[in-house]
């Protein structure tokens, strides 16, 4: 190989490394079928524009759900949702990541419907090693039924960040040094579902689903997945190799100054419940609540 050939090979290697680390790919709009498949009640799922948009439908007989075809350990996952409009009390739309075992890990978006004119509540939760009870609830700063908005999760070995339209609404930091489990080794699939939860979803179950408004429809598009596929112990080991992917890089190990300002804005203006400030429930705060300046 001549000098020119050697230089060309070096350039190719460097370009391939850039694909692995340093530069996150922007969300790519891909059809539903590329990454997802129905998980239950497929007859209540509608496919529009060749699968670029998908509607989940809830009526008295059933809701519906879908899941990713593959499992992932770390990455960036997003989709755009338009929630059920009108009187949606009792109706829950969920977008979450979860492993499939007893001591499971899970990262939740749960959109809790409400009476007409009353705002949606977005509840997030993080389960590690089977332990959850880390609820946070916010109002959104827009009407999520009028158009599509992006909801995403960044998950690496340092933190889990939950975003709404690129605004961080929650950061769950790795607090393993404080004895708090963190999702390192259990690959998770991505799920979404629409179902009736009027026993708890709206005002603790006081507001019931008004079935005269059925069918209820939640609409999805932009099914973006950029994660490390992990179906075997060997693949889990590869995904845990730090520095291999863009989400391992320094820029993604913590929020930047602008993201912290945006998170504080959400906390001050829109947060209505945070388990880390619930002294009645937790007279002694959970360890992870004392660690980070964003809590």
UniProtKB/Swiss-Prot annotation:
The record marks 108 as: Important for catalytic activity. It catalyses: breaks a beta-(1->4) bond in the backbone of a xyloglucan and transfers the xyloglucanyl segment on to O-4 of the non-reducing terminal glucose residue of an acceptor, which can be a xyloglucan or an oligosaccharide of xyloglucan. Catalyzes xyloglucan endohydrolysis (XEH) and/or endotransglycosylation (XET). Cleaves and religates xyloglucan polymers, an essential constituent of the primary cell wall, and thereby participates in cell wall construction of growing tissues. The active site is at residues 106, 110. This is Probable xyloglucan endotransglucosylase/hydrolase protein. Keywords: Apoplast, Cell wall, Cell wall biogenesis/degradation, Disulfide bond, Glycoprotein, Glycosidase, Hydrolase, Secreted, Signal, Transferase. GO terms for biological process: cell wall biogenesis; cell wall organization; xyloglucan metabolic process. The lineage of its organism: Eukaryota, Viridiplantae, Streptophyta, Embryophyta, Tracheophyta. Glycans are attached at residue 114. GO terms for molecular function: hydrolase activity, hydrolyzing O-glycosyl compounds; polysaccharide binding; xyloglucan:xyloglucosyl transferase activity. Its main location: secreted. Contains at least one intrachain disulfide bond essential for its enzymatic activity. PROSITE patterns: GH16_1 (PS01034), GH16_2 (PS51762). Its EC number is 2.4.1.207.
């Amino acid at each position: 190989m001549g000098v020119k050939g050697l230089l060309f090979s070096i350039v190719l290697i460097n370009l391939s490394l850039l694909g692995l680390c340093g530069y996150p790919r922007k969300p790519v709009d891909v059809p539903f079928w590329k990454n997802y498949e129905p998980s239950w009640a497929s007859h209540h799922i509608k496919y529009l524009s060749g699968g670029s948009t998908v509607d989940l439908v809830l009526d008295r007989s059933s809701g519906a759900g879908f899941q990713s075809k593959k499992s992932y350990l770390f990455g960036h996952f997003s989709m755009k949702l338009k929630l059920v409009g009108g009187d949606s009390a009792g109706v829950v739309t969920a977008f979450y990541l979860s492993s499939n075992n007893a001591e499971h890990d899970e990262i939740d978006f749960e959109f809790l419907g409400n009476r007409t004119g009353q705002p949606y509540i977005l509840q997030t939760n993080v389960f590690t090693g089977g332990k959850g009870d880390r609820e946070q609830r916010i109002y959104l700063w827009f009407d999520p039924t009028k158009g599509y908005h992006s909801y995403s999760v960044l998950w690496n070995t340092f933190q889990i960040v939950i975003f709404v339209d690129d605004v961080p609404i929650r950061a769950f930091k790795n607090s393993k040094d404080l004895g708090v489990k963190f999702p390192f080794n259990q690959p998770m699939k991505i799920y979404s579902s629409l179902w009736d939860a009027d026993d708890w979803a709206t005002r603790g179950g006081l507001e019931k689903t008004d079935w005269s408004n059925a069918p209820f429809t939640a609409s999805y598009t932009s099914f973006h997945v950029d994660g490390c596929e992990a179906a075997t112990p060997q693949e889990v080991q590869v995904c845990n190799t730090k520095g291999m992917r863009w989400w391992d890089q320094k820029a993604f190990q913590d929020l930047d100054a602008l993201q912290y300002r945006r998170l504080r804005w959400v906390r001050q203006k829109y947060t209505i419940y945070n388990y880390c400030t619930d002294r009645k429930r937790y007279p002694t705060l959970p360890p992870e609540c004392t660690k980070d300046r964003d809590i």
